[in-house]
């Protein structure tokens, strides 16, 4: 007799977009200038950066600045915010930095500060 683990899910989709830990303590923020300077064509690393989305290039692509450096960011399609953003809105972005010809951060989550 072979026993295999089985998962059973009752009814539909259980992915709550608002689910997760609501942590309000300190967060290690990456220095954007250092991340860019230390990158190569194949660099991929998780980052948390704080600053502003200063220009929209496409429906999900923006220019982000921390006040010292700029980088292109692409927002995940699943990101939904309760409030609109503008070029003066201070945000914290959680995502993955990717080096290359056009270094960018693929943003998984935005926190309005």
Enumerate the language-model features and the residues they cover.
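OB-fold and OB-like single-stranded nucleic-acid-recognition modules
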Residues: 6-113
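Sec-dependent N-terminal signal peptides of Gram-negative exported proteins
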Residues: 1-4
């Amino acid at each position: 007799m072979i026993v295999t683990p089985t998962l059973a899910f009752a009814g539909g989709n259980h992915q709550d977009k608002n689910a997760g830990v609501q942590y309000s303590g300190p967060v290690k923020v990456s220095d954007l200038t250092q991340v860019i300077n230390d990158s190569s064509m194949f660099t991929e690393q998780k980052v948390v950066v704080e600053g502003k989305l200063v220009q929209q290039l496409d429906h999900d692509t923006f220019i982000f600045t921390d006040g010292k450096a700029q980088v292109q960011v692409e927002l995940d399609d699943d990101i939904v915010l309760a409030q609109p953003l503008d070029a003066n809105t201070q945000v914290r972005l959680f995502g993955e930095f990717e080096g290359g010809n056009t270094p960018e951060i693929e943003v998984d989550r935005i926190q309005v500060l």
